[in-house]
Structure formats: C-alpha cells, structure tokens
Swiss-Prot record:
Disulfide bonds: none annotated. It catalyses: a (2R,3R)-dihydroflavonol + 2-oxoglutarate + O2 = a flavonol + succinate + CO2 + H2O; a (2S)-flavan-4-one + 2-oxoglutarate + O2 = a (2R,3R)-dihydroflavonol + succinate + CO2. The lineage of its organism: Eukaryota, Viridiplantae, Streptophyta, Embryophyta, Tracheophyta. GO terms for molecular function: flavanone 3-dioxygenase activity; flavonol synthase activity; L-ascorbic acid binding; metal ion binding. Its cofactor is Fe cation; L-ascorbate. One of its GO terms (cellular component) is cytoplasm. This is Flavonol synthase/flavanone 3-hydroxylase. Its EC number is 1.14.11.9, 1.14.20.6. Its main location: cytoplasm. Gene3D superfamilies: B-lactam Antibiotic, Isopenicillin N Synthase, Chain (2.60.120.330). Catalyzes the formation of flavonols from dihydroflavonols. It can act on dihydrokaempferol to produce kaempferol, on dihydroquercetin to produce quercitin and on dihydromyricetin to produce myricetin. Belongs to the iron/ascorbate-dependent oxidoreductase family.
Length: 337
C-alpha cells in the first residue's frame, strides 16, 4: 500500500532530515524548550486510602495543570512491560509486514497502521510532518474492537493488549469517579455524560525513531487532546513536553507511572473547571522513543456539552453542546467549534 514511514525517511537521509520535517523557529525544540529544567507535574498516589485527599489532589491537578502522573494504580508492572514489548516488536517488523495493517483509503475509521489524524500544517510550498509512525487500535469496550487492525505478529499482541485494557478499565472507573466528586457531582455523572459503558478506549502507539536533527523536528506538534482523558504509558526516552505559563518544558519520566492528560471533552463537560493540557513530543538523536496513549472517547454520535448540574444563572455554559463526531471533524479540519 506504500504507507509513508519516518523509519524509511531516516534510513534514506542519513545525517539530515527532509525540509518537510523542519519546524519553523517558533516551534523548533532547540529554540523553544526551557533547557536544564524538567517539569515535575503533580505525582498522585492512586492507592491513598484517604479519598478526600485524593479528590483534592486530582481536582487541583486537573484544574491547574491538566496533566499529572499517577503511581500505585494497581496495573501490574509486567502487564505494562508486555504491552510495551509487543508494541516495540511490531514496529521492528519489516515495513511490508506492518503495511498489512494499514488503514484502507476509503475507511471512515482511524484504526490501522500509518494513519494520520490532523491535517498537516502547510508553510509556503512545504507541508510539515511529524517525526513519528503510528498504529491505532480500539481496545475497549469489546463491542467496538476490530481485530482486523490488530497485528498477528508478534503472536502475543492481542493477549497483551486485552490484559492491559482489562486493568486500565479499573483505573478509568476510579478516575472518572474522583473527577466527578471533585466537581461536586455524584460519582457516575461524568462517565454517564461521556457515554457511559460505551466510552471507547482508542490506543495509539507512537513510534519515534532516532532523528538526525532533533533540534529542528517534532514528533507530535503542540496540541490538546480531543478526548475526555488520555492515559499514557511512555518508554524511558525523554520526549513529552508540556506548556506551562507559555513556555515548553520536558516532563519528568517516572517508571510505571501513568501520565494523565485532561482532554477537550473533559474541559467542556466540567464547563472549564478542568483544563485541557497543551503538549507536544520531541525526538531523540540516538534512541527510539515509543509511547502508548489511550484516548477515552465518547461514541461519535454521543452529544457532549457542559454538565447541566454545573450550569446556572451565575455560571453560564462556556462551550457549545454537540456530537463528539462533529467536534472531531471541526478540530481535525481546523474549523471553528
């Protein structure tokens, strides 16, 4: 199918990168990163028996940062290690084998290998690209899983991802409950507002091969996630950056922690109480970075808006209410919401 591959670009342009990967000066990480300082976003012990304390920590981190890391989340380290191992093995396969899972051109689904989400940014005659290859799979609920796009090699890919999804489901249930309670709502309110048991878990494996000029390129351009919440597992290669007070900082890597991003739909449902985090990804000259974000998304036809219990004469709705699919269409195509 001839899927575009950054790995192929790297092999054919040793020591340099093509112009379409070189960002403008106001984006280049070599210029825009605050060097020598790693941003220590809040670290939250998810096993703390003091629920009131946990609610306060989650609420403050979701409001002030939009990003935090949770530890002691009860997902066994071996489950995370297996998830990482099978993802890495897939991307190390020959290009032709990976392309067997490419998204068909006429498919309405995002799932598959080598898919792109956002329209690439055009500057003059040059279309800018991120230094990254992708694989998208829906992993929960079982009713939306399409094994057509799940790699059969390595053979343990399915088992590792299903095991991770099962454990992640428990984390999601608890996190949504705490986020609801932090807004003064009943524990199930935000989950219901996001689609209830039909909330979809979209796994995206980001594969960032070594880049000869990491000072000029980005893996993923600055953005906020469209999801309600994104739960991310990185490998140990630095790359995640967050924007704080208008400046870009590396986010500290913590082994076996889950990185939480508040997404656009959570900001909307909370009527602005929780903040969708602006973040981006840099790349490394010598090492491959891989990350496993799971986007928790409402079904496309599910209507999302500020939660009715958070809106009154004093607190007017700050966001429009619309189908999630319409929101996605507008954001991908850079149309007004």
């Amino acid at each position: 199918m001839g899927v575009e591959s950054v790995e192929r670009e790297r092999e054919s342009n040793e020591g340099t990168i093509p112009a379409e990967f070189i960002r403008s000066e106001n984006e280049q990480p070599g210029i825009t990163t605050v060097h020598g300082k790693v941003l220590e976003v809040p670290i939250i012990d998810f096993s703390d028996p003091d629920e009131e304390k946990l609610i306060v920590q989650i609420t403050e981190a979701s409001s002030n940062w939009g990003m935090y890391q949770i530890v002691n989340h009860d997902i066994p380290s071996e489950v995370i290690s297996k998830l990482q191992a099978v993802g890495k093995e897939f991307f190390e396969l020959p290009q032709e084998e990976k392309e067997a899972y490419a998204k068909p051109p006429d498919s309405a689904s995002i799932e598959g290998y080598g898919t792109k989400l956002f329209k690439e940014i055009s500057e003059g005659d040059t279309t800018k690209k991120g230094w990254v290859d992708n694989l998208f799979n829906k992993i929960w609920p079982p009713s939306v899983v399409n094994y057509q796009f799940w790699p059969k090699n390595p053979p343990s890919y399915r088992e590792a991802n299903e095991e991770y999804a099962k454990h992640l489901h428990n984390v999601v249930e608890k996190l949504f409950r705490l986020l609801s309670l932090g807004l003064g709502l009943e524990g199930q309110e935000l989950k219901k507002a996001a689609g209830g048991d039909n909330l979809e878990y979209l796994l995206k494996i980001n594969y960032y091969p070594p880049c000869p000029r990491p000072d000029l390129a980005l893996g993923v351009v600055a953005h906020t996630d469209m999801s309600t919440v994104t739960i991310l597992v990185p490998n140990d290669v630095q790359g995640l950056q967050a924007c704080k007070d208008g400046r870009w900082y590396d986010v500290k890597y913590i082994p076996n922690a889950l990185v939480i991003h508040i997404g656009d739909q959570m900001e909307i449902m909370s009527n602005g109480k929780y903040t969708s985090v602006l973040h981006r990804t840099t790349v490394n000259k010598d090492k491959t970075r891989i990350s496993w974000p799971v986007f928790l998304e409402p079904p496309a036809d599910h209507v999302v808006g500020p939660h009715p219990q958070l809106v009154n004469a004093v607190n007017q709705p700050k966001y429009k209410t619309k189908k999630y699919g319409d929101y996605v269409y507008c954001k991908i195509n850079k149309l007004p919401q």
